[in-house]
């Protein structure tokens, strides 16, 4: 086995791990929604979409044996993570500044009209307001945890893209 094969195997394992982490995060969101009665707002649902997209791209990439295709999927993961960072940062700023709103009247119909909201309403239907602050977990608000998660994913995947850029030529 050469170094490229070992690196590919390692990368695919890390992508599988990322996919499972995203599933765990979405399961945690459902736990908070249904057990703790913390209704998701439009920005929460958008963050769920980003975590779902990252997980789907990670699982698809893990099944590929071609560096170029993996690189494309990792680029898509990085784009979704960047979108998640922006959404979570906006959500966190709304919760830190109580006079603001996410624009529930504007965002809610758009988010609720997306096809996944029709297919999986328990997961992707809006039921709350962005300015509702739920109890922090270990001193950090939920959008703060999402921001940390998206930022870690973005940095990890961006470093992987940078580290493996030479494999694209080969």
From Swiss-Prot:
Periplasmic-facing ranges: 32-49, 90-144
Q: Which segments does the topology annotation call Cytoplasmic? A: 1-14, 65-71, 164-170
Q: Where are the transmembrane segments?
A: 15-31, 50-64, 72-89, 145-163
Keyword Zinc-finger annotated: no
Localization recorded for this chain is:
Cell inner membrane
Pfam hit, one: DsbB
**InterPro entries on file:** DiS_bond_form_DsbB/BdbC (IPR003752), Disulphide_bond_form_DsbB (IPR022920), DsbB (IPR050183), DsbB-like_sf (IPR023380)
Membrane topology recorded in Swiss-Prot or TrEMBL? Multi-pass membrane protein
Superkingdom, according to UniProt? Bacteria
Task: Please state the protein's primary subcellular location.
Answer: membrane
An example of a Gene Ontology BP annotation on this entry?
Answer: protein folding
Q: List the disulfide bonds.
A: 41-44, 102-130
Locate the coiled-coil region(s) and give their ranges: none
Which key words are in the record? Cell inner membrane, Cell membrane, Chaperone, Disulfide bond, Electron transport, Membrane, Oxidoreductase, Redox-active center, Transmembrane, Transmembrane helix, Transport
Could you give one GO CC term from the UniProt record? plasma membrane
GO molecular-function terms, A-Z? electron transfer activity; protein-disulfide reductase activity
Kindly give the PANTHER family that the UniProt entry links to this protein: DISULFIDE BOND FORMATION PROTEIN B
Protein family according to the UniProt entry: Belongs to the DsbB family.
* Function, in words: Required for disulfide bond formation in some periplasmic proteins. Acts by oxidizing the DsbA protein.
- Protein name per UniProt: Disulfide bond formation protein B
């Amino acid at each position: 086995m050469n170094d490229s094969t070992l690196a590919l195997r390692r990368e695919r394992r890390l992508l599988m791990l990322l996919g499972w982490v995203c599933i765990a995060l979405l399961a945690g969101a459902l736990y908070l929604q249904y057990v703790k009665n913390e209704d998701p707002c439009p920005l929460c649902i958008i963050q769920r979409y980003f975590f779902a997209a990252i997980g789907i791209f990670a699982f698809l990439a893990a099944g590929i044996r071609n560096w170029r295709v993996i690189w494309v999927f990792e680029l898509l993961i990085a784009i979704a993570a960047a979108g998640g960072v922006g959404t979570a940062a906006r959500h966190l700023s709304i919760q830190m500044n109580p006079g603001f709103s996410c624009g529930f009247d504007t965002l809610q119909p758009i988010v609720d009209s997306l096809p996944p909201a029709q297919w999986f309403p328990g997961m992707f239907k809006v039921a709350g307001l962005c300015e509702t602050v739920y109890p922090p977990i270990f001193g950090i608000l939920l959008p703060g945890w999402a921001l940390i998660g998206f930022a870690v994913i973005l940095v990890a995947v961006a470093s992987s893209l940078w580290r493996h850029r030479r494999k694209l030529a080969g």
